[in-house]
Regions:
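Non-catalytic, mostly N-terminal accessory regions of nucleic-acid modification and defense proteins
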Residues: 1-183
Length: 183
């Protein structure tokens, strides 16, 4: 996909999200939600690609980090935090949370827990200051998303789907800066 096509798709998606959240979230908060979810997706996919590649190089070509259970994933937690600066359990990866989102009546609580867990994973690591408060502006329990938990979760599902549908390409071959462009 060309740089211009990627940029056009990004802008189209951001406008779609804006229409979905219209009337409930102001422009500043809107940016926090979009950028926060983009970043959550980015670090999830980046971690998955990194761990999958490590395992493939070790002779395990069928390995898929996203499919591990928590116990299996915890085996490499300390090493991953040391190498990447953070850790996300497979069930908490963007793609896996998104896949369950429509059927999660507590999606707002799930996301709040995931964000807290990601930030906490860096505690004591060199990256601690980088992750401390990282998701503070992405308030998944805000009344601005809707007056009820069900309404908030509907909007969060739309946000997850819109960000998840973006074609961001490979991390090694980005032709646009998605975060800068979204901002």
């Amino acid at each position: 996909m060309s740089k211009e096509a990627e940029r056009a798709e990004l802008h189209k998606t951001i406008w779609r999200i804006a229409n979905d959240l219209r009337g409930s979230v102001d422009g500043w908060d809107f940016k926090s939600y979009v950028l926060g979810m983009l970043f959550y997706r980015f670090i999830s996919e980046n971690l998955t690609a990194y761990l999958n590649e490590q395992e493939r190089q070790a002779g395990n070509p069928e390995f898929d980090y996203a499919k591990l259970n928590a116990k299996e994933a915890a085996y490499g937690l300390a090493e991953t935090v040391n190498e990447k600066g953070f850790f996300i359990f497979p069930a908490d990866l963007f793609a896996n949370v998104r896949a369950r989102a429509r059927h999660d009546p507590n999606l707002n609580e799930t996301l709040a827990r995931v964000f807290t867990t990601i930030e906490a994973s860096a505690k004591g690591a060199a990256s601690e200051d980088d992750f401390k408060g990282l998701f503070d502006d992405l308030d998944v329990n805000s009344n601005k998303l809707g007056p009820t938990v069900a309404r908030r979760n509907e909007r969060l599902v739309k946000l997850l789907d819109a960000v998840g549908d973006l074609n961001l390409g490979s991390y090694t071959d980005h032709t646009i800066d998605a975060f800068g462009d979204a901002y």
